[in-house]
Amino acid sequence: MIHSKRLRLWLYLVLLAVFIGACGMKKEESSKDKQIKENFNKTLSLYPTKNLEDFYDKEGFRDQEFEKGDKGTWIIHSKMTIETNGKNMESRGLVLYVDRNTRTTKGEFIVRELWEDKKGYSRSKEKEYPVKMEHNKIIPTKPIADDKLRKEIENFKFFVQYGDFKDINDYKDGDISYNPNVPSYSAKYQLSNDDYNVKQLRKRYDIPTKKAPKLLIKGDGDLKGSSIGHKNLEFTFIENKEENIYFTDSINFKPTE
């Protein structure tokens, strides 16, 4: 009888220890999830910034990588990539370097095409069109004979100018992940076509699918902040061997080169 009571007591203590350990792990995971969301919210709070010149006065995260007196450079990049069945993959986007020291901005509009040759080797070609930004307008710095392309560049809007994540905390069933070895972290959400940002993308791009996208927010580097790390947004509408349709966006603050 005494042996039986001791056995029951031992089993009770083991179960209690397992329960406490599980609660501790769950609490730690919840704390990490919260930290990841807070980290992303700092970047997402930049959306929208309708006037790109506002970045001249926006301060980003600074660390020992910055030299004394360097105010830093914002790097803004928006790109749409489309590959439909039987056609080459094409990406069109613009990257802008906003130098807070000189209060000048330069960048490139980039058109890239990818395909496989008859032997199955990947091939690509890329064209870059240099631009500058003045008075919140994108201006090509070299003549462009193609009027349609020139207007596309001049009318280009970055996602940060119209995207809005004020409802990010209402997104449900997010898949939060963290890899301490890199370190890297991400949050993935299934969006609907009624989502504000999805509507904005469809308004500006000819997206050849009615499928609603998944939103992936990802970053790397120290969760507390790092000028070495990067943060990116990716709206993936379709992703398979035959078709790929996705939009990527990033805003990063770096030491001026």
Swiss-Prot record:
Signal peptide coordinates: 1-22
Pfam families assigned to the protein according to its UniProt record, in alphabetical order: DUF576
Lipid attachment in record (S-diacylglycerol cysteine): C23
Membrane topology, record value: Lipid-anchor
Gene3D superfamilies associated with the record: 2.50.20.40
Keyword Protease: no
A GO CC term attached to the entry: plasma membrane
Lipidation feature positions (N-palmitoyl cysteine): C23
Keyword field: Cell membrane, Lipoprotein, Membrane, Palmitate, Signal
Domain of life: Bacteria
Compartment list: Cell membrane
UniProt-listed NCBIfam families: SA_tandem_lipo
Entry similarity comment: Belongs to the staphylococcal tandem lipoprotein family.
Protein name as catalogued: Uncharacterized lipoprotein SAOUHSC_02789
